[in-house]
């Protein structure tokens, strides 16, 4: 890849340096892995075109978009992920003085729906309380039911759920201590009596399987910690069966995956009257304003508010 600053001579060196920069900025290993995967596809595309990184222009980006959209059949959300990785990469190159500017920013504003429409979080599918009740009560498998109910009752991310160990559950006050992550400020989440019922049911089954790992959720095949795809499959097959998930639709609102539980959790707590700052605390959102650092919420008060506002699902 000729034409680029000689300090970094190969695409792999660039990727390695970029990944180190991402880690220094506090990004998760999973986010860095996804960025690198997208960037390797872009770099291979440039290699086939015999184009260097500092020679990329709008026409090359249009060609890459055509390649992703029409040859790889990438969906809109996937396209956004590709160009998010590219934008972060070109930000880094510009910061290091390896390119003159980030050419991705104006391109994605024009061609990608998320940025063209000027919103940051596309509308995800939102189930009613009755629909969520139908979903979780349609799940007979004790592990999958526990996953669905725990996601709905806590609003935690898929990665946070996967890292929960059995010992992280506090049965005295119905809380879970999550593993530390750069994305989260508050590590304690609460659950209610409905969630406790399905968790205990799953733990009885899990105990009979006698896994060596301390992971709360395990694979039936390997008896090891459940994977990201394992959680996805555990949710999507039931949502699809009830008509809540259409894998063939290009619209995000026609899809239902693990992150939709977080959207549901947030929306229904707010609709049930929970103060916004309490919802942010339960979600573990980063404190963005200086005054937030000095605003401490009493844990017991937060727990009472949670129990008053979290919807019942009739499990």
Residue ranges and their predicted role:
Residues 151-173:
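Short, charged phosphate-coordinating catalytic segments
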Residues 1-3, 309-315:
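C-terminal secondary-structure termini that scaffold catalytic or DNA-interacting sites
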Residues 129-158:
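Basic, Lys/Arg- and aromatic-enriched nucleic-acid-binding interface segment
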Residues 99-101, 112-133, 183-194, 209-214:
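DNA breakage-rejoining catalytic core of tyrosine-based enzymes
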Residues 283-308:
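Catalytic-site neighborhood detector that most strongly recognizes the C-terminal catalytic loop/helix
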Residues 1-5, 12-119:
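N-terminal core-binding DNA-recognition domain of tyrosine recombinases/integrases
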Residues 232-281:
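Short, basic (Lys/Arg/His-rich) helix/loop patches that form interaction surfaces
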Residues 182-201, 213-237:
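C-terminal catalytic core of Y-nucleophile DNA break-rejoin enzymes
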